[in-house]
C-alpha cells in the first residue's frame, strides 16, 4: 500500500528543477504507475517547468493513465500557445488517449490549429474517439500496454502494411493503424518497414515511427534511428523520439549515437540523450524496474 506521504515525496522529486532530469523522469513514471488524484495533481503542477521534454512527457503520462480527472489540465495545455508545439501536441494526443467523448468539440476546434503538429494530432484524436464510439470501446489488448493514438489495422501481411504506412495519399489515421499493426507483428521485416517511415513528409508521423521503434526494440532499425538523430535539419520532436528509441534498444551502436549528441545545441535533443542514456543503463543493467521512485524512497535512510 502506498501512503499519501510517499506520493507527495515522489511528487516533490518530479517538480524540483534542482533534481537531475533522470530522477524526475523516474518519479514521473512512478506516479503514472501509482495513479489516482494525488499523482495527477503532482504531474499537473510541473507544467510550468522550462523543459519542453519533461512537459511533453507529463502530458503523455496523463493520457496513458486514462483518468478523466486530468482532462481540464490537458485542455489548458492544448489551448496555451505559450507552450511548445511538442507539449501542446502531446496534450492533444493525451485527450484522445483518455477516450472521453466530452473533448470531441475542443479537439475538432484545434484540428485546424496553425501549428501543423498540433492540428494533425487533434485530427487523429478525433478519429480515435469516433472509432471508439463506433466500435463500443477500446481495441482488444495487444502485446504492448500503451494506449495508442490509433487502433492497429486488421491486416496482418507485412508487405501490405508497409505499403499502407508509406502511402502519403492515404489518411494519416489509416497510416497510423498500419504503423501499430507492424509494431505488433514484430520482427526484422516489420522493423525495417517502420524505419522507412522516418523519411515520410509529416514530422508528427516521423516522430511516431521513432516512438514505435523504441517499443519494438529491434536492432535492425538502429542505423536509421541514429541517422535521424544525427540530422540537425530534422524536427527536434523527431530527433527526441529517435534518441529515446536508441536508449530502449540499448545496443553498443546506440550508446555511441547517444553519446555523440549528449551536448547537442538543441536542448530537447540534448535532454533526450541524457534520459536515453539512463534508459540504456537500465536496459543493460540489473535493475528490475525503470519507474523506481517508490523503491528509491523506501530504500532511503530515514
Curated annotation (Swiss-Prot):
Family: Belongs to the deoxyhypusine hydroxylase family.
Known outcome of mutating residue 207 to A: Loss of deoxyhypusine monooxygenase activity. Loss of iron-binding
Reported function: Catalyzes the hydroxylation of the N(6)-(4-aminobutyl)-L-lysine intermediate produced by deoxyhypusine synthase/DHPS on a critical lysine of the eukaryotic translation initiation factor 5A/eIF-5A. This is the second step of the post-translational modification of that lysine into an unusual amino acid residue named hypusine. Hypusination is unique to mature eIF-5A factor and is essential for its function.
Organism: Homo sapiens (Human)
GO BP terms in the entry: peptidyl-lysine modification to peptidyl-hypusine
Listed PANTHER family: DEOXYHYPUSINE HYDROXYLASE (PTHR12697:SF5), PBS LYASE HEAT-LIKE PROTEIN (PTHR12697)
EC number per UniProt: 1.14.99.29
Coiled-coil residue spans: none
Disease: Neurodevelopmental disorder with microcephaly, cerebral atrophy, and visual impairment: An autosomal recessive disorder characterized by global developmental delay, intellectual disability, facial dysmorphism, and microcephaly.
Keyword tRNA-binding found: no
Record protein name field: Deoxyhypusine hydroxylase
Record's keyword annotation contains NADP: no
Catalytic activity reported: [eIF5A protein]-deoxyhypusine + AH2 + O2 = [eIF5A protein]-hypusine + A + H2O
Binding positions for Fe cation 1 per the UniProt entry: 56, 240-241
Details of cofactor binding: Binds 2 Fe(2+) ions per subunit.
Cofactor (UniProt): Fe(2+)
InterPro entries: ARM-like, ARM-type_fold, Deoxyhypusine_hydroxylase, HEAT_type_2, PBS_lyase_HEAT
Activity across pH: Optimum pH is 8-8.5 at 37 degrees Celsius.
Positions that bind Fe cation 2: 89-90, 207
Phenotype upon changing residue 223 to L: In NEDMVIC; uncertain significance
Molecular function terms from GO: deoxyhypusine monooxygenase activity; iron ion binding
Record pathway: Protein modification; eIF5A hypusination
Keyword vocabulary terms for this entry: Acetylation, Disease variant, Hypusine biosynthesis, Intellectual disability, Iron, Metal-binding, Monooxygenase, Oxidoreductase, Repeat
Pfam families with a match to the protein in the record: HEAT_2
Amino acid at each position: 500500500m502506498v501512503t499519501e506521504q510517499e506520493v507527495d515525496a515522489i511528487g516533490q522529486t518530479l517538480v524540483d528543477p534542482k533534481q537531475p532530469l533522470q530522477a524526475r523522469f523516474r518519479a514521473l513514471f512512478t506516479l503514472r504507475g501509482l495513479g489516482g488524484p494525488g499523482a495527477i495533481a503532482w504531474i499537473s503542477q510541473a507544467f510550468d517547468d522550462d523543459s519542453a521534454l519533461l512537459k511533453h512527457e507529463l502530458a503523455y503520462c496523463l493520457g496513458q493513465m486514462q483518468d478523466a480527472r486530468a482532462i481540464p489540465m490537458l485542455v489548458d495545455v492544448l489551448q496555451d500557445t505559450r507552450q511548445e508545439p511538442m507539449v501542446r501536441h502531446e496534450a492533444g494526443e493525451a485527450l484522445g488517449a483518455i477516450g472521453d467523448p466530452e473533448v470531441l468539440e475542443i479537439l475538432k476546434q484545434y484540428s485546424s490549429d496553425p501549428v501543423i503538429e498540433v492540428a494533425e494530432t487533434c485530427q487523429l484524436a478525433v478519429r480515435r474517439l469516433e472509432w471508439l464510439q463506433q466500435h463500443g470501446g477500446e481495441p482488444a489488448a495487444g502485446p504492448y500496454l500503451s494506449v495508442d493514438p490509433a487502433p492497429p489495422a486488421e491486416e496482418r501481411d507485412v508487405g501490405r502494411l508497409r505499403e499502407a504506412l508509406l502511402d502519403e495519399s492515404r489518411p494519416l489515421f489509416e497510416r497510423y493503424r498500419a504503423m501499430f499493426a507492424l509494431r505488433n507483428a514484430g520482427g526484422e521485416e516489420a522493423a525495417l518497414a517502420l524505419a522507412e517511415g522516418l523519411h515520410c513528409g509529416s514530422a508528427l508521423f516521423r516522430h511516431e515511427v521513432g516512438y514505435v521503434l523504441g517499443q519494438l526494440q529491434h536492432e535492425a532499425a538502429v542505423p536509421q534511428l541514429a541517422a535521424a538523430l544525427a540530422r540537425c535539419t530534422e524536427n527536434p520532436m523527431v530527433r527526441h523520439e529517435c534518441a529515446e528509441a536508441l536508449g530502449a534498444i540499448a545496443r553498443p551502436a546506440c550508446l555511441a549515437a547517444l553519446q555523440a549528441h549528449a551536448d547537442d545545441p538543441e536542448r530537447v535533443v540534448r535532454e533526450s540523450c541524457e534520459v536515453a542514456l539512463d534508459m540504456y543503463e537500465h536496459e543493460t543493467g540489473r535493475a528490475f524496474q525503470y519507474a523506481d521512485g517508490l523503491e528509491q524512497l523506501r530504500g532511503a535512510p530515514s
